[in-house]
Amino acid sequence: MLRLKKNQQRELEPVTTKETWSKELRAKIQELLETYFFEPLIDATKETTLDNAVPKTLAQHIKSGLVWYDGAYFRGKKSVALSKEIRSLGGVFSTSEKAWRLPENRMPQDLRNTIAERRRQAQVLTKQFSEVITKLQKQIQLSAPKLNFDVEAAKTDRALQKEMQRKVPASVSIQPVLNDEQKAHMATDYTENVQLSIMGFIDSEVERFRKQILPQIQKGMNRKDLAEYVQERLGVGKDRAKFIARQETALFTSKLREVQYQKAGIEKYRWRAIGGKSGDGRTRDAHMEAHGKEFFWDHSKNKNPVRNSEGQPVHPGEDFGCRCQAIPIVEEIK
């Protein structure tokens, strides 16, 4: 225990989580999302037959999937020739929908037959795509418990120890205090949290596909547009992988710091919000309010702890996307 003068405090330099610490975890999560979810979905959107003929008429465009009829409007590709043909059939262009409107009962029979056939194909594609996302979701639910991130946890731990040795003064003795069993327990929690985050994202994506995309496929959305949408969501998946990696790494390092500080007799810290009391436009109100205040690492000792959206007490850096810092306070005693 430190022996210094009474009634004085000394603030230590904060040890913050580095962006590089989550790099390997981000790459691993991204690979999992691509391999087990997005790439199979992209494969499911590929055409099984090829037709190299260039469509010219409205019916040919509908057959090719470049244009589809949703029951009121023609959607998809637009051209002067198509506009002229639809207008000749009595169609009216809607500026609000940015599409041509034409009641089906005013169409010639051959065009109605083409639309009916395309609807049948759309039903088949809807069923196929629905089965694919259900199958992938079940596969990931079975695979997720087998995922292991112990290596990433160990590397993050080593990086944290190195950073603490660099920033904490030699007069403050902070040594690794976790035995192998404790480290294994924290690594298990880390892995389980990452697994839950991955599954949460997959479940939300499946729900999104069911609510937003399957109805569009049912109306006639073609494979090309479907593939483009999946590619767009793949980009979202990459962003999510980065977010999950950042968040879980921040939580893991926060827990490690908390244990080591307490073992060293450092029971309190001062909350430092980005932008101080005024924030910077991204800082949470509660975090701006906490700026400059002292808190115990032991939440049970805090009368008014900072809480997340779920009502759980949190330290700086533990809430989603939180960039705040915990400034360790060394209490000087006789």
Where are these regions (language model features)?
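N-terminal leader/targeting and assembly helices and adjacent pre-domain segments
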Residues: 1-58, 62-65, 109-236, 330-334
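Accessory DNA-engaging acidic/polar modules
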Residues: 52-112
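Short glycine-rich, basic-tinged beta-strand/loop micro-motifs
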Residues: 62-73, 225, 263-278
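Ordered, soluble secondary-structure elements with a strong preference for glycine-centered loop motifs
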Residues: 76-77, 200, 239
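Residue-level detector of short coil/turn "hinge" positions at structural boundaries
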Residues: 93-94, 223, 238, 268
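Short loop/turn and capping residues at structural boundaries
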Residues: 96-97, 227, 242, 299
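Acidic, glycine-rich two-metal-ion catalytic cores of nucleic acid-processing enzymes
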Residues: 235-236, 240-334
